[in-house]
Amino acid sequence: MPTVKEVTFNLLRKLGITNIVGNPGSTEETFLKNFPEDFDYVMALQEASVVGIADGLSQGLRKPVIVNVHTGAGLGNAMGNLLTAYLNKTPLIITAGQQTREMLLMEPFLTNIDATQLPKPWVKWAYQPARAEDVPGAFLRAYATAIQEPAGPVFLSLPLDDWDKEMSFETPVRSVSTRKGPDPDCLKTFANKLNAARNPVLIYGGDIARAGANAWANGVAFAERLNAAVWDAPFCERTPFP
């Protein structure tokens, strides 16, 4: 039977998530053992750099990137840039190793105590699977949660002995919609008010930069159609206008 690790990596392949940035330790060794050649693992010297690299990479690729840090200490080091990724609405899947399940009761060295509390409130969802068999499903939910608007980081705490456990089933991939749109009636009212304005001003936010390749061009065309000045929203996390 396949292992939890094999099922998880197969799932990640189907989701198109093959980029990982990390600064691992002993609690991540089982995840890294026999690492598949079709995945890219970028190692950085400190966890703040790890999250910063992953944030930029995810924005550039326009898809989630996995972050791999070392139990509670590594996650603590990552918190500053995790806050930034949250404000950037970047879909990162943050993973941290955890002590073996059979030892967690005694809280030995390297145990991440209250693991799901540490990254809050700067993640959309935090979870430690109840069983080894739940690890692939946890990744699927993490993916879905991270990419749905407003996008943002999520966190998984993963006991180090889970990866080599056997699984009797594959985790099916489900489709996840990220589309969002305004209410048609509200949009009509908004358009009428804009058309009636004598000196309109547009304030663009980071959603334009996240919306895809045509969003900038559409933003420019909209401003030109109205002959309107354009301003960035205060403390905008991404550049919305060229």
Show the residue positions of the predicted features.
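N-terminal alpha/beta PP-like core and its mobile active-site loop of ThDP/TPP-dependent enzymes
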Residues: 1-242
